[in-house]
Structures are given as C-alpha cells and as structure tokens.
Amino acid sequence: MKNVLKYLLLALIAVSQLFACGGSDDEKAPADNFDVQFTVPGSVDVTEGGECTFAVSGGGRKSPLTTDTFILESDAGISYVCPIVNTTSDSFTVRLADGCETGYYKVFVKRDARKKSFGRIYINIVEDIDFKPDAGTTVYGIVSSAGVGVENVVVSDGAEVTVTNEKGIYQLKSAKKWGYVFISVPSGYEVPSVGVLPQFHRALKNSADVVERADFKLEKVDGQDSYKIFMLGDMHLANRTGDLGQFAQFTSDLTDYMTRHKGEKMYALTLGDMTWDLYWYSNSYYFPQYLNTVNSQIKNLQIFHTMGNHDNDFQTRSDYDAAVKYVDQICPTYYSFNIGKVHYVVMDDIDCSSYDGSTSRNYVKSLSAEQLDWLAKDLSHVDKTTPVVVAMHAQVFYPTTSGFKIDHDPVNTQRLFDILDGYTVRFVTGHTHKLFNVTPDAPIVDGHNFREYNSGSVCASWWWSGNLTPGIHIGTDGTPGGYGIWDVTGTDFQCLYKSTGWPEEYQFQIGRAHV
C-alpha cells in the first residue's frame, strides 16, 4: 500500500511539473515572435485615405501577411487599423485608415493574439499636387489658401531662400541644418495658430538625404491697412518673486486694452527673455510652462517671438545647442513676416558660442554671418520703399554721457547696416529693462534712415519691485513695467508705451521732494 501511494505521489509531482513547464513556456513566449521586419522612416507623405509602401529589411525576414493587422496608434491612444493591400518579398503596402490626421503614431503589426512594435512614424497628410521635385531637392511643398496655391510666397530653411511658383509650390535644396522650413507670411494673410503661436514654420522629420514635403495653409484677411502690434519686452517668468501673479496683472491689462479696441486688427511681438534660464532646471519652469501660462491668460492674439539671452540653454557648449529647446518648442531664432505694408524681421543677436555648460553664460551681442547671409536673401524680395522693422533682443545702440554708442559686435553690425542701407528701418529691442529712442538725426546712425526703440520690459526690475513693494512696479530707470503699442496705418507709425495698470495717457510723473 505504501509503495502504491509512493508511486501515485511521484506521478502527481511529475504531472504537475509537466503542466508547470508547459505554462511557463507559454508565459515566457514572446508576444512578437512572428517573422516580420521592415524599415519605418521618420515620416511619410500620404493623401487622406491613400496608400503608403514600406521596405522589408533584415536577412531572411518576411513581409507581413495580408491577413495581418497593421495598426497606427496616435499619441492620444487612438488606434487606426490600416488594411495591408499588397505584399512582396521586398515591400508591402497599406491603405491609410479613415480619420488619420497629420501627427506622430506608434506602429504595430498584429498576428492572431501576437502584437509586434516597430517604432514611431510621422504621418504627413498632404494633397495630391501632381509635382515631381527637381534632382537635389530635399524639401518641397505647397502654400495654399482656401485650396488654391499662393504665388510669390517667400520660403526658407534659414539658409536657402526661394519663392512659390504660380501654383504655390516651392522646392529647396536644403541641408536641413536647423530641421525646419518657414514662410515669410505674406501681406493680407495670416497662418493658423496653436495657442498664441502662429504656425509659420514646419519641423522636418528626416535626414538631409531624404526628400520630404512640408505644406503651409494661409487664411486671407482684411484690415491690415490699419492695425496694432504690441511690443512685449522682457518677461523673465520663472515661478519666483511672485512673478506669475504680477504677470496676471499684465495680461489682464492687455486683455482690457484689446477689449476696448475690439474690431481692430492686433498682433504681438516679444522682444526676448520670456523665460529665465537659471530657473529652467531649479524651478522646472521654461518654455512648456511659459506657454501654459500665456495660453491660459491671453486669447485671440498671435504672438510672434524673439529669442533673448535667457532663452538659451546654459547647460550646453555651442550656440546651436543652446537654441535647440527654443527652436523645438517656440519657433526659429530668425525669420520674417509681413503685416499690411510693413516687413518685419526677427533676428537672434545673442551668440552663445563660448558657453561651457556652466552658469557663466559667456555670450556676446552679435549677429552670425549665417543670419546676415539669410537677411540679404530675404530682403532681395522686399522693395526699398517698404518700411522694415527689425526685432532683436539686445540693443543696437546704448546711451552714453554724450549721446549713443554701438553696443554690438562692430564688424557684423556694420554689415547689418550695409544690408539695410536704403530702407527705412525701425529697430525694436529689449534687454536693458529701460526706455530710450534713437532717431535718424543721431550722429551714431551715420546718415541712415534708422531708428531704435528700446521698449522697456513687462517685468520691470525682474518682478522684484512689485514683490517687495506691492503696487510699485518700476524698472531701474524708473519706467513702470509695461509694453509698447504701435498703431500702424499704411506706412505710418504711432508708437506709445503703456504702463501696466495705468491708462495710455499716463506718460510722465514728477515726484515732489520733501524738504
């Protein structure tokens, strides 16, 4: 009897181990063990509901089966099932599912219960424009309004500059250094916005040897013969010294002003230092938080942006790397646009080439040769009779005891002046947290028809005065924190500085001394 029980016990143990081993094998079996491998490009251009083909890669690998399921999963977690319509040993083709929009997607192939991941792709939904790019072209696209191509729109990658043809199509032999392409928004049009940011540029997704397409949409608008543009000097938002609460007072003031002038065209242009690099890491406040703050408080206003020294990443070691976060999340560091009869140019005059990754932030006030080369090409499409507004963060001139001096790299500044010679130019700058103007009759201007408006700051004294003495919000020269308001009618400019919390008429105050 004991022997029988012994054998039964051994048999049960053996059977249990057999089932345990079988279950373990199933649990450890990879969910993606079917033999499919293909190349996922950085992006694909495809018409709505159109087809796209993928190359099969890997020695001995195979295409998916037509009975497999090809899935695109959006960043929002929505899955789109795209039918596999054809397969060969070298490639396979899928038809884009209805509802797929331009954007990033995770790529999966599912076979039975097994699901295999293949990475991430950018799906670019485009119109069929029946156009084959020239040899050497790496970026092309169409600029259109209401489904019709717009001719003579200036397009650039920051180095090469071209214009759209009669069908609104452009092409560039771009090295894709900056990874974007932008248009100079033409007069009489606007681009769509994401929050306050006008969408005049497109990020490129592929390497320089891959041809890709980037399209732009324009909306025709009226009312640009007379409009207002707000000049927003240094903000220095960093979530410190009560800055966010004080900033809300500024946005409330701006909103009230816009409400009183409802029906008029309005735009805005920052003058740099929207953020404060020292607090990007310690306070976790930089461009995403800045945009959240601004977008929650300012509505129905396109804000073009200028880069300041504090908008560069100090934990880098080159001018290019210092600007990467700004370019990725705000816009190009230099570009142009048109409103009405005025051509606006935004430039980056903070050179961070000597950054060493520390808080020393050894920048110089200078315009790169690359920017100046681009500017000359950009202005070749602008008539000399067109007024030009050049926005930069750091001042071109600076007051001295006897007048003004050039406060920039002298060599590149002289080249800037040479390029702008013959134009009526208004420089608008920030950086100093002060107010001063330079007019064409100043000797330092040397006969050019140049003006400079150093346009104060939103934050006044880096928000310190309002934090220490609530209700007193002044800069180092006594100017209250505020913003510029330019009324532009045709080619005529009326420029006003508005102090936050005060009416436009409040322009000067003298304190009486107590003796």
Residue ranges and their predicted role:
Residues I13, F70, V153-D157, V181:
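Hydrophobic beta-strand segments
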Residues V15-V44, R114-A135:
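Bacterial Sec-dependent N-terminal signal peptides
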Residues V40, V46-K116, G158-E160:
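Immunoglobulin-like IPT/TIG beta-sandwich domains and homologous Ig-like subdomains
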Residues D130-T138, S145, G188-Y281:
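N-terminal active-site segment of His-dependent metallophosphoesterases
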Residues V153-S174:
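Short, acidic Ser/Thr/Gly-rich low-complexity loop/linker segments typical of extracellular
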Residues P186-K205, V210-E212, W280-V382, D407, ...:
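Extended active-site neighborhood of metal-dependent phosphoesterases/phosphodiesterases
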Residues L379-F404:
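Short acidic, glycine-rich surface-loop motifs adjacent to enzyme active sites
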Residues A513-V515:
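Conserved small/polar residues in nucleotide/adenosyl-binding loops
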